């Protein structure tokens, strides 16, 4: 029997293939697939349940219903293999051929394929250059189309109605040819000469200038070329033969009660066959034209419904009023073939159960219930039982296991040893959602999980369930052990920090044991070592918190990596000395000699991993957990109501606030403040009161007064349980304690506005009904938000994975010198992220020099690890150019040096690592922690936004970058440049603070001067924008005519008069073309030139500008000539959280984007139109000026005559990433997206490495638009893969030809996913129909480069361990070796089979 199985296995040989091609099927091709024509709509005989002949389930066409048995029963058994029964015509073979044999239907009249007709843009329409409306009218028999005009005045493709057709017939007789229906379209398509048409269009393209026409022509050329190149014929878009799906893929299953469950496809096929047969009969009868026409139309509709039901007109419904599922519905959507069956298969050998805590487990173990283990490891147990001779057959083994005999349990123990299992918790948001453990058999029915891996799984023990999977093959077990074992996943791939970090109880226990306490029992002792400390504690002679001196032996690694001992007496506590016993050798004592909070413990594990490596860290983590649990239990920390201490001052603070509110109410009633001001002030008062209460409360909780040994009072950190939990980072936060013991504070209304009466009570006092009611809204909104957030975050992750899935590390070094400059992230006065955090684990792109010298500090191509980063910090390096995936030169994939360190492993990344997916998971996984809301800025926040000065925090020296300035009459610097930055440098040369300085700011200190901390270095008026003169002289008014271009206004309060320039809309007809300006002249009245140019100093004034000078006044440089009031933009909403991240990755244009200068040059304003200003930028080199129309209401940042650089901001607003890419380049757009995304995550306290965002940006920049084709095959304006252009240009340049020039494109992640070269990947993402239609017409080849395509075709993915397999396959292919599948010829096969059968099936037991 075994030989027989072996033989049958050898028959199915695996196909080796490198690519998959999709194309249109020609009628002959469809016939060649088919095993016979389906002529009847019948399915099976309702009495015998046998398939009807020539019907949809016909056994003659599709194969036998039972294995090796014909329908009438004449031939049975294996020996008649391949015989065709002469009675019923069925071939004797396996039933499974019914899954692969297709049939066909010969259509009596051609029908159009709806995908090529209706999937926009319509391929048939584009090819014929006819509107879709017209084609539809022809296809559905409403009008005629002219196919051949002959000698008449009718043109080809002209549409004729019934009457026009009859008139033409009368006039011309049979001179011309016009038809209707699909045959007409087919004739048109058939008679097209694609190549000639192509030539013609190319000529037209060269002649035309209009942009829209060009676009249309390129579209058509591309389609025609695709047809020519792929060998598809246009007329194949019209079906003359319809393939029929194999019957087992559209099953018909009898239910009990004589009814049938059937696939909808059978109904759809039946309609097609019925209508087709009726049409044949009508044609044979030569029925009247109108009847035949109607039948043809119905046939077209039936075929449409079969292919894609509901795409045209109403969907055909079944008996239960639900639309039938057509072929297109089978493959698209979440329930379609791609996502349901090809990418999401179910797994055999798996189980699931509830999880509970296993605090006694080691990190690499999990507790597995015996019942589950027995079921999961069945095949192994059967095998072992047979091997041992305890069971003769599988059946006997099965019986033994079912009876649960004693020997079975022993064998289970053996089988399980060293056999890892995979544990998975849904939702699997990142790769740490599946990890491998060694099972430990336990009683009960719940899986036990190690507490430290909960953070990675995001699991808790409130009823979560987890699934167990068994890796069956040896390779799978190896991979699980080497790569997926929980002990090998200590660092998070998102940020390279430990993810196996104790939380909650463990943190509390460690914090409690490392706290110190004044005058505790045993204070002042001197102990010989940690052992003695533990003995004293256990015997009750010393408290854990007692301050003692202990002799400690530390070990330090020397230069050779050997451990060197060093013993000293340390001031410490008993608890810390006890904890030292579990710390591995090689770490300094300082790391435990402090009160350990969560952050400190995380840092401790990180240090341990970096110094000592993986194994000691794992053991240490386990020991930390055991110790933490033990001492948390001993601490007895618990929460009682008295722990929530309400500050005495609370009452008084609240009554003060109430008094202030009453006062403002009075002011409002007497009309001194407006309603809006009153509201904002009230809210400010309450917010301040809340802060005071919570400060008083925290001060109260934080410290307690105790008597020390000398009898004096001393303050020490409190041992209040609630405070300890918050302080250690175990649970809770200051904000939560505030609600428990302070006051709840202000609440929001459903519309997002703040209710002005706060909740003054806290939870300890309890809320009254009104307060409770106000709180309900926020609570409910929180829950609703969470539900929305999960869905949105999941969808973002899906899009990210899809765009990045094919990015794999494919080579070691691409050799590029490109890279991005990394500087610390500084916002205002604080360093948000120091340089070391940003460059750690990256590779330098250029030599890093010692500041101020030419000495090389770090050579190029160095992977910066911790020690290098220390060196950079010591030498206070401020900027490092590092390699980045965005600038990597590898064609498909990236190189290891551009990526840098593998964050989860701590060394340079390996080849074959799937960095795209890791990046997508790292960005998507914290998505659920981001907020969903848009922030309304109102009240206190909006007033703070109008800053008017810069006050530095630290002392140091000032450094100004991209600055133009003049000195005013009082000797201060006045800034006249737009994007000036002011940085504060400390004495080591490090940047500490960074500020933007606006135009017109007055600086108190100049470049390079020293400042003290807290000094104000710059100030300006936030409400107006000044016009600063750069020269001294006398003011001369030009075109400033009272009543025409200006008007005089007098301020009521001060009595000063000023001139206001009128807006062009307010001027009289005479003043329309005048340009009011201030000219600076010298004493003789000659023009003064702007220094460094030959332009006269003349300042044009925009509308609404206020001038407070008189004609002829003497002024000096740096003085303000005029002021332009800035309209306050009102309260702007800031999109934050998840929607913001999605907007950035989708590269959406903001509503009113900033306007950037397209070229460098001098600004001037041309003729205005109604509502728009014409901005003209004239380049200095005299080339063509650039013009742009800008709406009047936009506030411009530039004056006439000012010089701007390409990419400078002309009008403020959110910048559009596309503009940044176009004007400032790839690095600028990368920096913009990375910084903006990081801002959102940083606000939530989530750390993500920049690399991951850069990986996604690289994928967004995959496409380029051809600007000039050169000698390449590309079309101008065509969008192509960037790597394709690079490869083509390299080849062209090697042959001495001109390459194509291109501009990079930024695509949103959805667009980029759909625009990938792999049609399989795109089709399984979204818009399946459109993608497949496009691919088929173009005859695309899918090279199966990405991960997704390979999963879909069922191969190992070309990443990780599969990467080597694919490399090897390619190498073997290149060497021309044959695939290793055994080849068997038909004769050999039948001979060996006969031999086997003759030997008898019973005789093989003796083996």
Curated annotation (Swiss-Prot):
Keywords: Acetylation, DNA-directed RNA polymerase, Magnesium, Metal-binding, Nucleotidyltransferase, Transcription, Transferase, Zinc. It holds the Pfam family RNA_pol_Rpb1_3. The modification N6-acetyllysine is found at residue 972. Its EC number is 2.7.7.6. Binds 1 Mg(2+) ion per subunit. Mg(2+) binds at residues 460, 462, 464. Its cofactor is Mg(2+); Zn(2+). It is an enzyme of class 2 (transferase). One of its GO terms (cellular component) is DNA-directed RNA polymerase complex. It catalyses: RNA(n) + a ribonucleoside 5'-triphosphate = RNA(n+1) + diphosphate. Zn(2+) 1 binds at residues 70, 72, 85, 88. Zn(2+) 2 binds at residues 814, 888, 895, 898. SUPFAM superfamilies: beta and beta-prime subunits of DNA dependent RNA-polymerase. GO terms for biological process: DNA-templated transcription. InterPro entries: DNA-dir_RpoC_beta_prime (IPR045867), DNA-dir_RpoC_beta_prime_bact (IPR012754), RNA_pol_asu (IPR000722), RNA_pol_N (IPR006592), RNA_pol_Rpb1_1 (IPR007080), RNA_pol_Rpb1_3 (IPR007066), RNA_pol_Rpb1_3_sf (IPR042102), RNA_pol_Rpb1_4 (IPR007083). PANTHER family: DNA-DIRECTED RNA POLYMERASE, DNA-DIRECTED RNA POLYMERASE SUBUNIT BETA. Belongs to the RNA polymerase beta' chain family. HAMAP family: RNApol_bact_RpoC (MF_01322). DNA-dependent RNA polymerase catalyzes the transcription of DNA into RNA using the four ribonucleoside triphosphates as substrates. The RNAP catalytic core consists of 2 alpha, 1 beta, 1 beta' and 1 omega subunit. When a sigma factor is associated with the core the holoenzyme is formed, which can initiate transcription. This is DNA-directed RNA polymerase subunit beta'. It comes from Escherichia coli (strain SMS-3-5 / SECEC).
